[in-house]
Amino acid sequence: YVMGHFRWDKF
């Protein structure tokens, strides 16, 4: 996780 899982990290 980087920020949380809004866009890129959600994959």
UniProtKB/Swiss-Prot annotation:
Keywords carried by this UniProt record: Amidation, Hormone, Secreted
Cellular localization per UniProt: Secreted
GO molecular function term, any single one: hormone activity
Keyword Transcription: no
Gene Ontology terms: cellular component: extracellular region
Modified-residue entries (Phenylalanine amide), positions: F11
Keyword Oxidoreductase among UniProt keywords: no
Domain of life: Eukaryota
Recorded family membership: Belongs to the POMC family.
Protein known as: Melanotropin gamma
